[in-house]
UniProtKB/Swiss-Prot annotation:
S-S bridge residues: none
Keywords annotated in UniProt: Cell inner membrane, Cell membrane, Conjugation, Membrane, Plasmid, Transmembrane, Transmembrane helix
Primary role: Required for efficient expression of pilin. Functions as a transient chaperone for propilin, preventing it from being prematurely degraded, and also promotes propilin translocation, positioning it in the membrane for processing to mature pilin.
Species assigned in the record: Escherichia coli (strain K12)
InterPro entries in alphabetical order: TraQ_proteobacteria
Compartment(s) of residence: Cell inner membrane
Chain segments annotated as transmembrane: 14-34, 37-57
Quaternary structure, from the entry: Interacts with pilin.
Protein name per the record: Protein TraQ
Gene Ontology CC, one term: plasma membrane
Topological relation to the membrane, as annotated: Multi-pass membrane protein
Superkingdom of origin organism: Bacteria
Coiled coil spans: none
Length: 94
């Protein structure tokens, strides 16, 4: 019987990504420091650049989501006010 559930890794937040990357980095650096110190330094710079870009992407993504939610709420409030104004204007009392 074949399972219909696909295997997927959990999505890491930026803190989890930092911890994971530092663990991988320390593991690799432990092997490279004595044999190729320049490669260990290059790897540190590469991982730092990737983490900064990934973190900046997540920060921008959260900011864009917040701004668009606020704009949507403001638009809904304006539409609601316009509908209420039209309903009040349509009712004429004698």
């Amino acid at each position: 019987m074949i399972s219909k559930r696909r295997f997927s890794l959990p999505r890491l937040d930026i803190t989890g990504m930092w911890v994971f990357s530092l663990g991988v980095w320390f593991h690799i650096v432990a092997r490279l420091v004595y044999s190729k110190p320049w490669m260990a330094f290059f790897l540190a710079e590469l991982i730092a650049a990737i983490l900064v870009l990934f973190g900046a992407y997540q920060v921008l993504d959260a900011w864009i989501a917040r701004v668009s939610r606020e704009e949507r709420e403001a638009l809904e409030a304006r539409q609601q006010a316009m509908m209420e104004g039209q309903q009040e204007g349509g009712h004429v009392s004698h």
